[in-house]
Design a protein with these regions (language model features):
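Sec-dependent N-terminal signal peptides of Gram-positive bacterial secreted proteins and lipoproteins
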Residues: 1-23
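Selective for proline/serine-rich intrinsically disordered segments
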Residues: 6-7, 27, 114
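Sec-dependent signal peptide cleavage junction
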Residues: 19-34
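Catalytic glycan-binding domains that act on GlcNAc-containing polysaccharides
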Residues: 31-32, 37-162
Length: 162
């Protein structure tokens, strides 16, 4: 007798998802703990192509504070998904420079940084990596902005005050 014939499909799917969650918790408990709950951000922004709830969800799943992500979006692009800065090098909502993040783009399947969802997914991944490396938002934001922990201190302070 096959297992599928004794267990209803919805129960089977639920069991698989639960086991997947347990495996995630064992492999990487920090990720599981961070995605157990949804952080609702205080900052609400009007961005075409992506909802506040979607930004909150992407940020939370990436293990970063949605308020910080939205503050970056406001600071970097003013919420314009078509923003281009730094002489054409920084693109989209979170003003990401693809020349520095090509490998991460490929890993995540990011095709267009002008796509608001893809831009936020990559921006959150970058910020999460930096937070993991430096252990605090001040240094992570400074490096996100300037490439080092010193030159972007004023930027980090502005983001954290929003």
């Amino acid at each position: 007798m096959k297992i599928k014939s004794i267990i209803p499909p919805t129960l089977f799917i639920s069991a698989v998802l639960t086991l997947n969650g347990i495996a995630t918790a064992i492999d990487n408990p920090q990720v599981y703990q961070q995605t157990e709950y949804k952080v609702v951000s205080n900052i609400q922004i009007d961005v075409k192509g992506i909802s506040n709830e979607m930004i909150d969800d992407i940020a939370t799943r990436s293990g970063v504070d949605p308020n910080i992500v939205k503050a970056i979006i406001v600071e970097e692009s003013g919420g314009n998904p078509n923003a281009v800065g730094d002489n054409g090098e920084s693109i989209g909502l979170m003003q990401i420079q693809p020349k520095h993040h090509q490998k991460r783009m490929e890993e995540l399947g990011i095709v267009s940084l002008f796509d608001p969802q893809e831009n936020v997914i990559l921006g959150c991944a970058i910020l999460s990596d930096l937070y993991d490396k430096y252990g605090n938002y001040e240094d992570a934001l400074s490096v996100y902005n300037s490439g080092n922990t010193e030159d972007g201190k004023a930027y980090a302070e502005r983001i954290l005050k929003k």
